[in-house]
UniProtKB/Swiss-Prot annotation:
UniProt main location, coarse: mitochondrion
InterPro entries the record matches: Pentatricopeptide_rpt, TPR-like_helical_dom_sf
SUBUNIT field: Component of the mitochondrial ribosome small subunit.
Compartment list: Mitochondrion
PPR repeat coordinates: 230-264, 265-299, 300-336, 341-370, 371-405, 406-440, 441-475, 476-510, 511-546
Any single Gene Ontology cellular-component annotation: ribonucleoprotein complex
Name of the molecule in the record: Small ribosomal subunit protein mS80 (rPPR6)
């Protein structure tokens, strides 16, 4: 678009002008036929009134004028036509309508006209003055206007355009030059000048120049029916402020669009939202989005996806979903990756998970086969909400229609079933997983074991542990930790101690937590400080540290038992 601005500005500078040269032509008289011919050429648009001027005098009075109807006007003879062509050729006219840069204004009365004088104006640049102006504009001269006045330039619109096309001039100086030039009544601000100015400032990306241009545009726009601005200029100004990171200025331009008599289009909304969202001005962005939705104007494909992504990143998933709904209404296609992004954003909030579920139905074909992430996100959210029923239903739908669920998706459902205490359902999902050729990992078994251990169902937990030992040579510390806590909860400390001793055989090194849990259980519940002290010695040998609280418990239980024994011995002696 900026290239088209520049081309239009270059086309405007084809007629070069500064020095005027006047020439006088010989006085000539033409017939009605010749006059009508000039008039036709003038009306065809090839003639320009400002270059050649014809001045007519009163024709000689005929003694017996004959008035003929229009349809009976005699046609000139061949000789007359030949004479006319030679005269036209002498004046620089040709049959093709090429006047050599001149134009005609013909005036005639009663079918006869005398051409008294022809003034041919040819405009040429004074290259020295042009270079002087450019040199001044490329400098940092503070008194720029004074310097321009001193050059005594014969201003013309083409001269101004030529200055704007010249490289190396700052946007600030171009604006100052334009304001100085428009003090001349013959120079007015045109669309091409504003476009050229926008091109120059956009290439430099200087913040203050951009603000200066906006002030000029506002001044132009506030003049009613000026016809200089257009929507594309405002759009590019919004883009410029967005590039500079000046979101407030971009929003100001957007707010003035309708005031200047233009209706925002899809590009206007897109550029404004881009400028606002990238700087997290989300309140303004939401108001622009709301206006866009009401207008029904929406970008295509990638741009629409970008708008959705910007809102999702800023936590505005509902606004993004509104854009998606409008796109569906207008049957606009959205690239699948943007659909997945929106589904993921909707899954973060329990209140919008329903929208995410509905959007899964919009994925089809290749997009659905590759859509494991959005499906997994929805199942994860349903499990977080403990909506196991819908989570399992979606899992079965994935098995039936795709995308094929992996271990991670099955684990989500198993975990949700275990947390809700529905361990039988968890085992069913585990069997379903195995039936599809998937090997449950240690985490899957651990989740079910933990569920059984929390419920005190240690026999069932041991069954799952035995199954896990068959499938995996190395288990997880979390697996044993859950079992040890389960046995301690039902006060079967010897079973817990057995598990601690077998951990090494399955590639698991007991950590301080397991020892600490058992030591505290032996001290507080079993009051067996001797076993607690044995475990403490094992920890020392393995280089593990027992916290001070547990060490204090061992000493306290040991002292308490000693005091109890002394008291008991004293009582026995007293009885004796």
């Amino acid at each position: 678009m900026l290239r088209s601005f520049l081309c239009r500005s270059q086309n405007a500078s084809r007629n070069l002008a500064v020095t005027r040269i006047s020439k006088k032509k010989t006085q000539t008289t033409h017939s009605l036929t010749s006059l009508s011919r000039f008039s036709y050429l003038e009306s065809s648009g090839n003639a320009s009134v400002r270059n050649i001027r014809f001045f007519s005098t009163s024709p000689p009075t005929e003694e017996n004028p004959v008035s003929l109807p229009a349809d009976e006007i005699p046609i000139s003879s061949a000789a007359e036509l030949t004479l006319e062509e030679s005269v036209a050729s002498a004046l620089g006219f040709s049959e093709s309508g090429d006047y050599g840069g001149t134009s005609v204004e013909a005036v005639g009365e009663d079918g006869d006209s005398e051409i008294v004088a022809i003034e041919n104006e040819v405009y040429q640049f004074d290259d020295e003055k042009l270079e002087s102006v450019l040199s001044l504009l490329r400098s940092d001269e503070e008194s720029l206007e004074f310097g321009l006045n001193a050059l005594n330039v014969d201003l013309h619109l083409d001269f101004v355009v030529r200055v704007f096309e010249s490289p190396g001039i700052s946007g600030k100086n171009l604006i100052r030059f334009l304001k100085w030039a428009t003090q001349n009544e013959e120079i007015t601000v045109t669309t091409s000048l504003v476009e050229s100015l926008l091109v120059a400032i956009a290439s430099d990306t200087r913040r203050m120049d951009a603000y200066g241009l906006w002030d000029l545009v506002k001044e132009i726009g506030e003049k009613e029916s000026c016809g200089v601005l257009n929507l594309e200029i405002l759009n590019e100004l919004i883009a410029l402020f967005g590039k500079l990171g000046k979101s407030k200025a971009a929003f100001d331009v957007f707010s003035k669009t309708e005031e200047f008599g233009f209706t925002p289009n899809a590009k206007t909304y897109y550029l404004t939202l881009e400028a606002l969202c990238k700087r997290s001005f989300m309140d303004w962005a939401c108001s622009v989005c709301e206006k866009m939705l009401k207008s029904g104007v929406l970008s295509e494909g990638e741009q629409m996806g970008n708008i959705i992504t910007w809102f999702c990143k800023e936590g505005k998933a509902e606004e993004a979903y509104s854009v998606y709904e409008l796109a569906k209404t207008k049957e606009k296609s959205l690239p699948p990756r943007f659909v997945a992004t929106l589904i993921t954003a909707l899954c973060k909030n329990d209140g919008t998970i329903t929208f995410a579920q509905e959007m899964l139905g919009d994925l089809s074909g290749e997009a659905r086969r590759r859509g494991i992430k959005p499906f997994s996100d929805v199942i994860h959210s349903l499990c977080r909400m403990r909506n196991v029923k819908d989570a399992k239903a979606l899992l079965l739908d994935m098995i039936s229609k795709g995308p094929a669920p992996g271990n991670a998706v099955f684990n989500l459902v198993v975990h949700a079933c275990s947390k809700t205490g529905d361990l039988d359902e968890a085992k069913e999902v585990l069997k379903l997983m195995e039936s599809r050729g998937l090997k449950p990992d240690v985490y899957t078994y651990t989740v079910i074991i933990s569920g059984y251990a929390k419920g005190g169902m240690m026999d069932e937990a041991q069954e799952i542990l035995a199954e896990a030992k068959k499938k995996h040579k190395k288990l997880s510390p979390v697996t044993y930790h859950a079992l040890i806590r389960g046995y301690c909860k039902i006060e079967e400390y010897d079973e817990a101690l057995k598990l601690l001793n077998e951990m090494d055989r399955f590639g698991v090194q007991p950590n301080a937590d397991e020892y600490n849990k058992l030591i505290q259980s032996f001290c507080l519940k079993a009051l067996d400080w001797e076993k607690a002290e044995v475990l403490f010695e094992e920890m020392k040998q393995k280089g593990l540290h027992l916290n001070a609280i547990s060490q204090g418990l061992i000493r306290a239980v040991k002292e308490m038992e000693s005091e109890a024994k002394v008291t008991e011995d004293g009582n026995l002696l007293a009885e004796a």
